[in-house]
């Protein structure tokens, strides 16, 4: 039936890792969606709790369509790749397992999507994230709709706050995360910035996604994560340094590159090759100072341009 084939057009994707006591909120919010035609794809990133029992019980309830995929522990970015490769539909909505959606979340996405659906300049739509009390994560904004690239929105206009990304699956298939063996943390900005160079997004100022975390302060684990996966961090910052962005943001990217480069086992000449000799001469000493401070306290609050997690 056309209704059945229509289900696959929209997919809510959730990577899970040992969050069995939290995923119930998200499940309940999916059950109460005003718009019913969607599939929930869950990729389990090698959980050690029995979250699969919970998901099987959801599947047995048979109230929404759920696809459950297991993978060896490889990090959220590999779970996203896996989800994208399994997704049959045209829209891919990334929702973390400890977050949940407003009742009309998918309905509003589908509403705004119709305006860019057949426009190849657009990679997708973005609604706003808010705290459980309804306040926006970041400053409130006054505009209703913005058509802009992610790089313009986030780095150049510097619009603070968190957005909920919904991408055309066909675009994401061309922008899978790189696979760097042995590293399990890659900020989503790697892919967001690459897409942002070539596509626009439709940003709509409606709260569609409820998150519980504090978005501002760089968490301790964020620094640790980048120290443990330095080659991903270096790739993000070297690409950021070459973007057409304000000078100060470029400088920050260069410093951050050399801040995490000492954690990488790459030969120095390869580190220099990735970002250029002048960057090495000018920014390596400053970056190295940050690295020494990171090593000392594993945490330093430099306002960081890029992904917050």
Which ranges hold each PLM region?
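Short, well-formed alpha-helical segments that are part of the catalytic scaffolds
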Residues: 18-32
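Catalytic core of nucleotide-sugar-dependent glycosyltransferases
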Residues: 209-211, 221-247
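Glycine-rich, basic loop-to-helix element that forms the pyrophosphate-binding segment
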Residues: 3, 71-87
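Conserved donor NDP-sugar-binding/catalytic core segment of glycosyltransferases
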Residues: 104-139
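Short, small-residue-biased leader/transition segments that mark boundaries at the very start
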Residues: 1-8
